[in-house]
Structures are given as C-alpha cells and as structure tokens.
From Swiss-Prot:
A Gene Ontology cellular-component term: cyclin/CDK positive transcription elongation factor complex
Primary gene name: CYCT1-1
InterPro entries assigned to the protein according to its UniProt record, in alphabetical order: Cyclin-like_dom, Cyclin-like_sf, Cyclin/Ssn8, Cyclin_N
The protein's name in its UniProt record: Cyclin-T1-4
Region (Disordered): 1-27, 276-330, 343-408, 460-543
Organism superkingdom: Eukaryota
Amino acid sequence: MAMMPSDSSHHGIVENSPYRTTQGRNEETGELGASWYFSRKEIEENSPSRRDGIDLKKESYLRKSYCTFLQDLGMRLKVPQVTIATAIVFCHRFYLRQSHAKNDRRTIATVCMFLAGKVEETPRPLKDVILVSYEIIHKKDPAAGQRIKQKEVYDQQKELILLAERVVLATLGFDLNVHHPYKPLVEAIRKFKVAQNALAQVAWNFVNDGLRTSLCLQFKPHHIAAGAIFLAAKFLKVKLPSDGEKVWWQEFDVTPRQLEEVSNQMLELYEQNCAAQAQPSHGNEAEGSSASVPNQRVSVKSEETPLPHQSKQSSSQHSTGAPSHHGVEHSNLEKQTVDQKMLQNDNGDHGSNKTRSNQSGSRVDFGANDGLHHDKQSMTENKNLPSHGNSSEIRDVNRNGNDGTNVTSLMVNKIDKDKVKAQMEKQRKLKGDVARKVEVIDDDDDLERQLEHDIELAVEDNKIKQERKQSSPHVMHRGDHRNADQVTGNGHLGKQNTPETAQDAPMDDIKEQRNSHGSKHHDSHDTAHERGERDYKRPRPEG
C-alpha cells in the first residue's frame, strides 16, 4: 500500500530514516558517491534491512517486487527500456543505504521512475506518473482510478511523492549518473558477425532479467554484458569468434572469475523462479553448472556444449521477452513437438481430417467425438456413391446387411461440415451479430451441436425406413442385388443392363426399391413410366 502522510511509514522516511546518519558516516569515509560497487557478501550481510529484521529471502522478494512494479509502470507510461533500467538502478542504490522496513518500495519506485524520466530525457508529467502508479498499487480496487482523480486524494499523493523525491536524491547523494550494459553489448555483437539479431535479442533479455538482481551493484556494465553474451551464445548454441590467441570475452576486460560469477547469478534467478512455481528443484544441477562455467569459458572454442540451465524466453516479460525456463524444459518441449509431428505424419490424411482450420485461424476438432468415427474403410468403400438431394440424407448401402453398423460414419461422410458452418455464419449475420467475436471453443460447440442435430434427423429418417422395410415380406438385402434380374417392358427377364452391385445401380433405382415398401410385382409399366423411373421386380427368395 502506498504511503500516505498520516502513515507511520511515511514519517519514517523523513524523521526516522537512517539516511542522515548513513550520509554522515559515508561522508567521513569518502564512500558516498565514490563507488556504487560492492561484493555480494557486503550487500547481503550489511544491508540496512537486515538490521530491521528483514532476512535475505524477504529482501530478495521485495527487490523483485519493485522491479516488476517499475516494469509495469514504465510500460504504461510508454517510456524506453533504458529509462526503466535507470529507475531500477536508482531503487537498488537507494535500498543499499535505506531499509525496506521504513520506506515503502512502491512509493520509492514511483519517485525513481519520475527521476529516471528526467535523467534519460524521456520525462513524463508528474500527474501522469502519480495517476498510473496509484492505479497499479491499488489494482485490486476498482474504484481507485476514480478516487485518485479527487483533488484531496491527489494532493496528498502528490505531496508524498515530492517529499520522497527529496529523500531519494539525498540518499543517492545527487549522483544520478548511470551506465547500462546495453551499449557495450550491442557494440561487441556488431563485431562478431555471427547470428547478430538473435544473439543481441537473447543477450538483451538476459541483461533485463539481471536487473532484478544486485548485479548492477557488484559489476560494471561491460562485465554484465559479457556474461549476458556468454549465456546467449550457449542458449543459441552459437560459437563466438576468436582472433588468434585472443578470445571474445577479453574484449570486455573481464576476468574468468567475474564472467563465471555474473553468469551464475543470472542463472540463479531462473532457478528461483522455478522453485517459486512449485517445480522440482535443480539445486544440485545448478551447483554443477557453476563449477563447469570456468572450463567452458576458457575452452570457449567448444561452445557447442550447452549449459545445463540454458534459458528460454519467457512469455511473462511483456516488453523484454526475457528467458525464464531451463534448457531441460526447452529440450523436452522440442521433443514433444517432434513427437507430435511424427504422429501426424503416421496418421496421414486421417489426422488432417480430424482438425480443420477456417480463415480466421479457428480450429474445429472433430476427433474428440469418437462416436462419429467408426470404420474408415467403410467410408472409403462408399465414397463413390452418388449423392442426391440433401447432403445429409443417409442411404442404406451396407453390404453385410447390418443396417445400423456404419450409419454414423456414413452420416459424417455425407454431412458437409463446411456448409453447416457457412449456414451458421449466415444466420449470425442475419441476426446482426457480424461484429461479435466468438471464441474457438464456442464455435466448436455450436458446430458440433449443429452436426449432432443433422445426424439425429438422419438417424430418425433411417429408422423410419428400416421399420417400413421390416414390415414388408419382400424386403431385399443389398447383397441380393447381385442376383436381381431386370424386368423389361414386355415382362421378360434380362441381364444385359442389370447392375452387379448396389454401387453400380443408379441411386434413383435404389431409392425406388425402398419406397416401394412391398408393392405388388404386377405394377403396370405405364405407371412406372409416368414417374420417369424404371421398376425392378424383386424375386421371391429361393427355397
């Protein structure tokens, strides 16, 4: 929660803040403004927050918290990434000399963003910074956006930010000079001429993720840039060039020990993220990777050997796309992708028929309804049957005489799913619902319900036909068509034009046979001629 003038934490900033005594002590030793670089041990053990009962784990959480807050604030204010990085460095330096227990991190972060905008010549109005910051701080309160627009609330918040700005400037000793690893990183990659775009992007992401740690308080910008390039090359499996006896990392004036430490601290961030997500810990593996970094660095020619914790770009970083997953997970994902492609190749056309894509990119999956897919061979055998009338009309052409065995598969074969979907879209447009965007799963459900409705109608029609056939004593199975002889106009039997199978017979003839329903064999030829159809006589079964 943001500090208000009446809060005790607010008074702690000015009255109880240790920055005055800290300033005096540092001025005596000549520390203030002279150097912002300390060892990791000094930062972790001598932190002012530690003296106020905040342990290392809690402080690490608070550090990541205000980094995330600044990233979100910077994106909403539409400032460059360099401005966001400067604000984060200001915060790190502030809490190097101030305690989290006495200074609200989000108020200090808001001030640092306001200062960073002016330092990097990308200023944002104080009013905009206050409004956006207040909305982020109270994002769970729907009324916060309207409350901050009230004059009394806004004036209180403005007074708080301006007061905190003076505290931040005094704590930093008015030293607002900040250098980032971005410039040396880009300049070095330009010289490599190897996968420049990909290498620069991944290394840039590692630098952005490194801002969430205390690396900027331990190492100079070009050292951090070297570590980011090293990890990016391992992640992309790119071999960095060397000029004779001089290897690439010597361009950064970095020692092997420094390169190792920078790389390992960057990797620790991803290990902590995995642990926070309740995933299996890889602590032992991480220790092994730490020990192996110097050897891999010295023999940098063998860079084809990846680190155990190569990182993958994270979807959680909106503007940076920073890596956040280990190489093990990345390799498993690749393996699953390959297996899926192999499975699709094995399935052939059958697999492609299960999923269809429309022009909008929506996927309609019919594979989930196993009841709609029976014997694929029966569908193939009947694919040459001519279609008449409605595309969803089902005709009994089952050779084995089991009337209902392949009815469902034939229904799916006959029903034109694209036409059904087109009809559904047409109905939506008629209702004035053109602008409405439908989710993929809703579209799938609507289409499946329409298909099921058509199938139910077809099944009912088929049942009616079956009942009529069973009520007739002269019903023929399809296999009996093989021995059926055509009745000519004068009553004589002939086999010249008799189809051998039901597939060879015109569909109108088959339909006429079904609609006869046991009609008398002495129907006149003239009556059949008036209907424009030929009449077949069904011989009585022998024996």
